[in-house]
Amino acid sequence: MASLIYRQLLTNSYSVDLHDEIEQIGSEKTQNVTINPGPFAQTRYAPVNWRHGEINDSTTVEPVLDGPYQPTTFKPPNDYWLLISSNTDGVVYESTNNSDFWTAVIAVEPRVSQTNRQYILFGENKQFNIENNSDKWKFFEMFKGSSQSNFSNRRTLTSNNRLVGMLKYGGRVWTFHGETPRATTDSSNTADLNNISIVIHSEFYIIPRSQESKCNEYINNGLPPIQNTRNVVPLSLSSRSIQYRRAQVNEDITISKTSLWKEMQYNRDIIIRFKFGNSVIKLGGLGYKWSEISYKAANYQYSYSRDGEQVTAHTTCSVNGVNNFSYNGGSLPTDFSISRYEVIKENSYVYIDYWDDSKAFRNMVYVRSLAANLNSVKCAGGSYNFRLPVGEWPIMNGGAVSLHFAGVTLSTQFTNFVSLNSLRFRFSLTVDEPSFSIIRTRTVNLYGLPAANPNNGNEYYEMSGRFSLISLVPTNDDYQTPIMNSVTVRQDLERQLSDLREEFNSLSQEIAMSQLIDLALLPLDMFSMFSGIKSTIDLTKSMATSVMKKFRKSKLATSISEMTNSLSDAASSASRSASVRSNLSVISNWTDASKSTSNITDLVNDVSTQTSTISKKLRLKEMITQTEGMSFDDISAAVLKTKIDMSTQIGKNTLPDIVTEASEKFIPKRSYRVLKDNEVMEINTEGKFFAYKVDTLNEIPFDINKFAELVTDSPVISAIIDFKTLKNLNDNYGITRMEALNLIKSNPNVLRNFINQNNPIIRNRIEQLILQCKL
């Protein structure tokens, strides 16, 4: 049977781990790495060993002891100590505001008897009587409060370190006085502190007032030893001046440069516009049921002005971590239902790939120091009308999330024409008001953003921000780095898969039913399934491994694993307490194991809900206990094989996704039956149920307890020809009991005979199954 391919994928998935391990060991053992000598390997490759140049840092670290500076005249800043080092006798400094403050400090060497000395202060000759009987230097602070007054000695500092200090702070001028090492500070008043200027005749240092304790230490104990060597050269005070320049958001900075390569830092402010893509798929039938409402990747191209430059940008928006919701209004064909609709919430992420035509993206291959900062944006959903043929329409309305920047990486965007190295911005989500509801249903006050109408009529959502990166680019600006050298993070196959899905779905009309039945009866294996793509055995093995890696994470593989565990648990429970077994316990094996006995009792009353729950696991039961009849998976695998052979776009990279998706999505509307003597019990995935006699095809009451017992003990059969088709066939053509029994058992030979006879009812049923094989 063709469905053998699915069983092989389920049972052989374990070999993938072993294959990966062997491949990794082989790679480690045989990998050769060659690095050519010299600064660069080849001109078309990046440097073998490249490092960053100067790293700009906006953090300003203020030194404790800044200097020494050469003698100068300037207006000292407030809140900074001037520490002046006198290396000879005479005037150390002069300071005035030309209104109420004149002061000068005179240095006198040790052991000087009382005498008169001449000094030039503020351009005038002044004579002072000085004396120093100590072994230390003395610094006389001479002061006057007006231009007509005479100087007088206000303070004296006795020091063997030959250091004096001066500070403008708090409307006063502060200096040191006393004798080291116990000198202290004192101050003089002035009404015009800011206009005080100073003429310094010796080398000096600058110390912030926040480090006044250090200044006190230097006055009393001397400068650090390093400041007293001949290697310390005083600088001009102009070297301290800083040219303030407002940083440009958009700029290109050359970090380092050689003959072939240079490092460029690109700073850019950006405007990101994006929109969500979605897909709404309606089930066939009367028009009351929807199959899927899901998010899809969406491209958006736009232009905006940046510093007078017109920029063309391209974004791709995709989502990850979606939450699957469903709504089932009942089992009748006219009951409204949605099999699955996606909602993004707090556990979801939104990815926006951004590219523009500026220099920053031209050679964005070797990148480091990537950083970004973006604003948040709120996305509020709109309304979507489920247009039913009759009655008032349900409306999905509302829902909102806020996007918050969470990181940036490199990526590759695939447009219709070219692949682009771009930036991928990652956003975390928080739910926001309003909540969403499906009006005229029980679904109300849920939070998140559903995929029905995420753009709410807006052409795009917009956010602003900036990014910075350092890129290694060719020194020649006209040279384009080959895209083949790209080390971007991701290779996105979504565009290829989308084209392949369209091709696969269009091939359904070209499948011959007689050949399909023959193919469905063949035991397909890995080689025969993939031989239509590549003829060599080695490539087929590699493709089979890739398919198994993808398939083991599929819903089918996960469901088989969960069911095996559930049945094991149920068997062990039954062996421990065999006497407790009842119909309800049998039913619980086929319903949600987490429900309590009381809940199951309530569910029995709703036969439609119960049968719908059971039918979802009958595919797994049929796959575990294979019968001789044809199954839906045989047809599914045969259609898959046929389309693979007919496809012109299938390839090694897309095959794993296609096989896995086909196993989950081909023939979603299935019916299963169990046969006991002359009675048949049949249910389908939509919750419909029938019980009827084999010989007359007349309906009888459906007993769910009996059905649960039969499912446990009897084989499950795919209802290829369901009860509705059987009834129609019997009413129009008349069939014998043996033909009816063979069709009930899905006998492939009988099916082939009816198709070869061009029976329109059977052919139409098989055609409908083929048309359900869509991606």
UniProtKB/Swiss-Prot annotation:
A motif (YGL motif) lies at residues 447-449. GO terms for cellular component: host cell endoplasmic reticulum-Golgi intermediate compartment; host cell plasma membrane; host cell rough endoplasmic reticulum; host cytoskeleton; membrane; viral outer capsid. Residues 388-408 are annotated as: Hydrophobic. A motif (KID motif) lies at residues 643-645. It comes from the Viruses. Disulfide bonds join 317-379. Residues 247-478 are annotated as: Spike body and stalk (antigen domain). Keywords: Capsid protein, Coiled coil, Disulfide bond, Hemagglutinin, Host cell membrane, Host cytoplasm, Host cytoskeleton, Host endoplasmic reticulum, Host membrane, Host-virus interaction, Membrane, Outer capsid protein, Viral attachment to host cell, Viral penetration into host cytoplasm, Viral penetration via permeabilization of host membrane, Virion, Virus entry into host cell. Residues 65-223 are annotated as: Spike head. This strain probably does not use sialic acid to attach to the host cell. HAMAP family: Rota_A_VP4, Rota_VP4. This is Outer capsid protein VP4. It comes from Rotavirus A (strain RVA/Human/Philippines/L26/1987/G12P1B[4]) (RV-A).
